[in-house]
Swiss-Prot record:
One of its GO terms (biological process) is respiratory chain complex IV assembly. One of its GO terms (molecular function) is cytochrome-c oxidase activity. Residues 1-15, 67-72, 153-155, 224-232 are mitochondrial matrix. Residues 35-40, 106-128, 184-190, 257-261 are mitochondrial intermembrane. InterPro entries: Cyt_c/ubiquinol_Oxase_su3, Cyt_c_oxase_su3_dom, Cyt_c_oxidase-like_su3, Cyt_c_oxidase_su3-like_sf, Cyt_c_oxidase_su3_a-hlx. Belongs to the cytochrome c oxidase subunit 3 family. Its EC number is 7.1.1.9. It comes from Eudorcas rufifrons (Red-fronted gazelle). This is Cytochrome c oxidase subunit 3. The keyword S-adenosyl-L-methionine does not apply.
Length: 261
């Protein structure tokens, strides 16, 4: 083993960036094949290779940080900056959807009937399932904060309980959203209202699924005693991401469900 005179992690050569790029190519090509030729072979291949790449890449990161000690305070600081920049990029991603929604709704064209919601669209009642979804996500924000405080205080059992509650609430939100989509009186093809509604809420739903998966990984890592009160960036990143998902939903609820209806 060579002697290291600095606090930074010099990453070993890894095949995962290459396999990740190839899986992304397969997924995008597969989507085109699915849309135009109703063939899902390439898409399934891309999704499978992408899942395998993510599993093996993050397995390596966990090994390097938890078992090999490569994630020094300086490395963790860099990872925190990286996560902050990633969340900022996600904010800009959702800004595009809100821009499309407000561009269409604040000055509805004659084709839409000069009103919003457009003529013929029956919007969902914001005081029914959407309000329940809001309370579910707000409760999950409280429970993830409870988990974080429990971890900082060294209370492992409370941390696991709070994390489990957060995951359960995330899964419940996803099921409620799926039932709402199934019962919705309009579709993604119903003009600009349908497309902005389903694209914005659908991408948020995808982020909830990603965040829930992130938290499930943290739950199993905590079962194996991977986190301590001063070394838990994996969980911290998951908590930041979950709070971001909460805040985006509040904007979606106020804009699309309440004001937009």
């Amino acid at each position: 083993m060579t002697r290291q005179t600095h606090a930074y992690h010099m990453v070993n050569p890894s095949p995962w960036p290459l396999t990740g790029a190839l899986s992304a190519l397969l997924m995008t090509s597969g989507l085109i094949m699915w849309f135009h030729f109703n063939s899902t072979i390439l898409l399934m291949l891309g999704l499978t290779t992408n899942m395998l790449t993510m599993y093996q890449w993050w397995r390596d990161v966990i090994r390097e940080s938890t078992f090999q000690g490569h994630h020094t305070p300086n490395v963790q600081k860099g990872l925190r900056y990286g996560m902050i920049l990633f969340i900022i990029s996600e904010v800009l991603f959702f800004t595009g959807f809100f821009w499309a929604f407000y561009h269409s709704s604040l000055a509805p064209t004659p084709e839409l009937g000069g009103c919003w919601p457009p003529t013929g669209i029956h919007p969902l009642n914001p005081l029914e399932v959407p309000l329940l979804n809001t309370s579910v996500l707000l409760a999950s924000g409280v429970s993830i904060t409870w988990a974080h405080h429990s971890l900082m205080e060294g209370n492992r059992n409370h941390m696991l309980q709070a994390l489990f509650i957060t995951i359960a609430l995330g899964v419940y939100f996803t099921l409620l959203q799926a039932s709402e989509y199934y019962e919705a009186p309009f579709t993604i093809s119903d003009g600009v209202y349908g497309s902005t509604f389903f694209v914005a809420t659908g991408f948020h739903g995808l982020h909830v699924i990603i965040g829930s998966t992130f938290l499930i990984v943290c739950f199993f890592r905590q079962l194996k005693f991977h986190f301590t009160s001063n070394h838990h960036f994996g969980f911290e990143a998951a908590a930041w991401y979950w709070h971001f998902v909460d805040v985006v939903w509040l904007f979606l609820y106020v804009s699309i469900y309440w004001w937009g209806s």
